[in-house]
Regions:
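Proline/glycine-rich low-complexity loops and linkers
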Residues: 1-5
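Small-residue (G/A/S/T)-rich helix-start motifs and N-terminal tracts that mark the onset
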Residues: 6-156, 160, 164-182, 186-314
Length: 314
């Protein structure tokens, strides 16, 4: 439904963290995100379509010791309908990633020479780029983030270590010509905007809005009732998900879904809030089947087909 009902608005104030004086602003430019709302954004797949029809996602993720983040993001992207997945990783990760994600193609790079021509070529060809999941913050990772910001044509999704890298120089977010989506958890958001956790918790809605408008990026501020803010001031508050998702790796799954939807040429703001809704809906299915205690981020990926069945009306 358009806007937030009075009961839901009270829940938002209590659970999400919005100041009372901003409550009356919510109906005009803030909407709740329900699975039923996003279904019209997903057209039927073209019977004449091929893998190129559904986008080319480039992931620049993973590093020694953090291959799992890359694997989870990649599998989530593949379960979210992307046509081609290209993963740029250091040579050392190939023996781990190749058997874990057999559907992907790989662009291998030497960290001492990053980004390198192969990665730059992959950035040029991508319809969307996802950067940061398990990437680390070494000097070569900084160069990779800069290369994407300076050269990407399609939507750029920045998560995890990409945000930690940019915390020192958030003005770099103003560089890209392409749309940018950032997906910070509260700690990453505080590092980006220099505010305290107490300040953020006091008004999550305004925190996301101000950052989105200041840096012209779609801001996905994760948490209970994830807030998705556009540079225009338009805002969404997600209604799906549960505390069982509060485990390391859930954010990588969300990043993969977001990247996949962007690669399929969905409008960036719609892709951002749809991905959050789908991610939470998968989490709710997991909680029902496996319990909030026992569910894992990898279980979210396996529930994505059920969510897309609902979206397709089957």
């Amino acid at each position: 439904s358009r806007g937030l009902g009075d009961v839901y608005k009270r829940q938002v104030v209590r659970q999400v963290g919005i100041k009372e004086e901003h409550l009356e602003m919510l109906p005009c430019d803030t909407e709740s995100v329900l699975l039923g709302n996003i279904c019209p954004l997903f057209p039927k797949r073209d019977p004449e379509g091929h893998k190129g029809t559904y986008g080319r996602l480039l992931m620049i993720c993973g590093s020694v010791g953090m291959a799992g983040a890359c694997i989870m993001a990649a599998r989530a992207a593949l379960r979210s309908g992307v046509g081609l997945l290209n993963i740029a990783i250091p040579h050392a990760l190939y023996p781990i990633l190749a058997p874990a994600v057999p559907e992907a193609i790989f662009t291998l790079y030497d960290p001492t020479e990053a980004p390198g021509e192969a990665v730059l070529d992959a950035i040029d060809k991508a319809s969307a780029c996802l950067v940061g999941c398990g990437l680390g913050t070494a000097p070569y990772a900084v160069k990779l983030v800069d290369a994407v910001l300076e050269n990407a044509h399609g939507t750029v999704v920045l998560d995890a270590d990409a945000l930690n890298i940019l915390a020192k120089t958030p003005e770099k977010l103003l560089v890209p010509q392409a749309p940018v989506i950032i997906t910070p958890h509260p700690g990453e958001m505080c590092r980006l905007n220099g505010r305290t956790m107490a300040e953020l918790r006091a008004d999550r809605l305004q925190t996301a809005r101000v950052f989105a408008q200041t840096y012209r990026v779609i801001t996905v501020l994760k948490g209970a009732g994830t807030i998705i803010a556009a540079p225009s001031g338009e805002t969404r508050v997600n209604t799906t998900g549960n505390p069982g998702m509060a485990k390391g790796g859930s954010g990588d799954v969300l990043a993969g879904i977001t990247g996949a939807l962007c690669a399929q040429n969905m409008q960036p703001f719609e892709a951002a809030y749809s991905a959050v809704c789908i991610h939470g809906a998968a989490g709710d299915l997991c909680a029902e089947a496996l319990s909030q205690h026992g569910m894992l981020p990898t279980d979210l990926i396996e529930k994505l087909p059920q969510v897309f069945l609902q979206i397709e009306g089957k």
